[in-house]
Amino acid sequence: MKNFTRSETKKERVKMDKKKGIFYTIVSATAFGLTPLLCASANKLGATPETLVFLRNLFVIPVLFIVCKAQKIDLKMGGTDLKHAFIVGVFGMTATALLLYNAYLYLPVGTVTTLHFLYPVFVALIGLVVFKEKISKVKGFVLLIATCGIFFFLESMEGSNALLGIVLSVLSGGTYAFYMSGIEIFKLNKINSYKLTLYLAIFSAIVMLGYSLVTGKLSLSQMVPMAYVYAFIIGIGTSFLAVYTLQLGIKYLGASTAAIFCMFEPVTAVVGELIVFGTPLTPMKIMGCIVILGSVTLLTVLDKKAEAKEAKVALEAQAEAGKA
């Protein structure tokens, strides 16, 4: 009877964790999806992409610090974790934001966000190149179809600026794949989410300040007051709300499952762009969205099935070892 009760309790806990993970991931995706609209508005008010990335992290640091202190979270971090957090924060989170914010200058935000969602392709490539993971024929075909989805967005795009926007958008998928993989590979998901987000924001703010000063792209004096308001909202919405809830989503669901529910981000961006800016949705763009997002969803499902199969094989091997 006790074992039955424990089993039921464990099932309920797993079910509750799954619901939490889904909720947190959808909140994160929605917040990320609305961010491009604010970025586009801030750009029109004098903010450069570099300045926005710097400010969004700067503004959220005191908020996160207060939250950590209020919850009595130990802010000490070991040297190895610090190094890994710096690598993931700069080359993952910061690079992704910088590439995306620059891409918004050349392409509609909905297009940029959808192209950015090719990142599962890069996750698979990281597994192939770095970890020598095998890619099945079916998975390889899905990856190819997802990549082909890019061509649907070449409709009516003339000049090098549009092509640059596409390149930046796709590259942002690569850096984001590194961020998602790095959180798990370096076991940073075991660190308190508020604490980790605080360190990521600090590293990002420092690096972006230096980068902006060196490149001369810090536009603080050219920005009107409303641009600062947008930057603050972006900071709270992304570096605090979206990043924090995404980490919780990964914690409760795992990166592969969380990726499915992250699909709410491009949907939010496309619908938001249509409502706010009145950007038309052509049949080619709709088809491109369907091809990329459909392929990514299928890719994620294939990954989940592969993980389940590996877990089953491991359990069977363990059972056989126990008999011996």
Question: Where are the predicted features?
Answer:
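Hydrophobic transmembrane alpha-helices of multi-pass small-molecule transport proteins
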Residues: 126, 135-155, 208, 263, ...
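Specific transmembrane alpha-helical segments of multi-pass solute transporters/efflux pumps
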Residues: 31-36, 65-110, 116, 152, ...
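Hydrophobic alpha-helical transmembrane segments of multi-pass integral membrane proteins
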Residues: 19-24, 50-67, 87, 142-145, ...
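Glycine-/small-residue-enriched transmembrane alpha-helix faces in small-molecule transporters
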Residues: 2-55, 159-185, 206, 313-324
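Specific alpha-helical transmembrane segments that line the substrate/conduction pathway
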Residues: 51-61, 100-134, 139, 172, ...
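Membrane-interface helix-cap regions at the ends of transmembrane helices
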Residues: 34, 41, 45, 60-78, ...
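Transmembrane alpha-helical core positions of polytopic small-molecule transporters
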Residues: 32-33, 88-97, 120, 154, ...
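Helix-helix packing/entry segments at the starts of transmembrane helices
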Residues: 29, 55, 97, 112-118, ...
